[in-house]
């Protein structure tokens, strides 16, 4: 059987809700309850369409600690000066107002599969009949020797959009004349293969305007990357010799940094 959105909703509507809601009250205790953990693009979209397509027949709870979500997609356009930061931000008010979703701003710290409960950092418990876990992507600790999350303010990653993106742009704007912007590209596999090279392109666009003698150095452990021919053609046409990429043949697969 194909498990699509319609199938999921039909299955959830057929479920019998027998658990109480001691900490987070659902609007209708007799309805099946779906809990979504994670309010990024995936989780928020799932919560929205379950609530919308069920026509109120399913109680939907979205657990997300942040009150504002900034998309990583399009954040490169902010770095390049094509978008404002506030255009990347999304609150959760419309999910509650338009679709009746119960938005809970806490960290989810555990799941009890037997009791069908999600534990919250504040000690609360959220009951469910169906559970969707959409926590998003995260860093692989130790993937770049010498760097961990404690160094993110000195050497921002900006792959989780928000304050990190703003910090990275501020550091780019403050680069000395003729300075060097360095980026360690990730090895395969990772989300959005063209993303690092789109970022380089936008940083180059900004530097061409404010610091045209600056250089960009990419340490790339991959022998080739997504849309490489198009990127390299565009870099040469628009930015001349500003961008240099070092591949594994020159040791980029054994990179370390010192924040």
Predicted regions and their residues:
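Glycine-rich dinucleotide-binding loop and its adjacent helix/turn
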Residues: 135-210
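A Rossmann-like FAD-binding core segment of flavoenzymes
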Residues: 98, 102-110, 118, 126, ...
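Core beta-strand elements of the Rossmann-like FAD/NAD(P) dinucleotide-binding domain
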Residues: 122-130
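N-terminal secretory signal peptides and thylakoid transit peptides that target proteins
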Residues: 1-15
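Short, well-ordered coil/turn residues at beta-beta hairpins
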Residues: 11, 134-135
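Beta1-alpha1 glycine-rich phosphate/pyrophosphate-binding loop at the start
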Residues: 27-102, 187-229
């Amino acid at each position: 059987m194909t498990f699509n959105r319609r199938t999921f909703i039909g299955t959830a509507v057929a479920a019998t809700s027998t658990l109480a809601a001691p900490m987070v009250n659902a609007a209708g205790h007799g309805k099946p309850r779906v809990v979504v953990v994670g309010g990024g693009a995936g989780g928020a979209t799932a919560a929205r369409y379950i609530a919308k397509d069920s026509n109120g027949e399913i109680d939907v709870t979205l657990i997300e600690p942040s009150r504002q979500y900034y998309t990583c997609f399009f954040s490169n356009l902010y770095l390049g000066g094509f978008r404002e930061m506030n255009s990347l931000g999304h609150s959760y008010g419309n999910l509650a107002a338009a679709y009746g979703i119960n938005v809970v701003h806490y960290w989810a710290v555990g799941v009890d599969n037997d009791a069908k409960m999600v534990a919250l950092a504040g000690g609360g418990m959220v009951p469910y009949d169906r559970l969707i876990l959409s926590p998003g992507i995260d860093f692989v600790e130790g993937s770049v020797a010498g760097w961990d999350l404690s160094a993110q303010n000195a050497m921002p990653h900006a792959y989780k959009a928000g304050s990190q993106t703003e910090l990275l742009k501020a550091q780019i704007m403050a680069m000395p004349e003729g300075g060097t912007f360095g980026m360690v590209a990730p090895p395969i596999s990772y989300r959005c293969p063209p993303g690092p090279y789109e970022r380089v392109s936008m940083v180059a666009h900004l530097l061409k305007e404010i610091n045209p003698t600056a250089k960009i150095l990419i340490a790339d452990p991959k022998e080739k990357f997504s849309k490489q021919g198009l990127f390299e053609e565009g870099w040469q046409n628009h930015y001349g010799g500003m961008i240099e990429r070092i591949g594994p043949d020159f040791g980029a697969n054994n990179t370390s940094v010192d924040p």
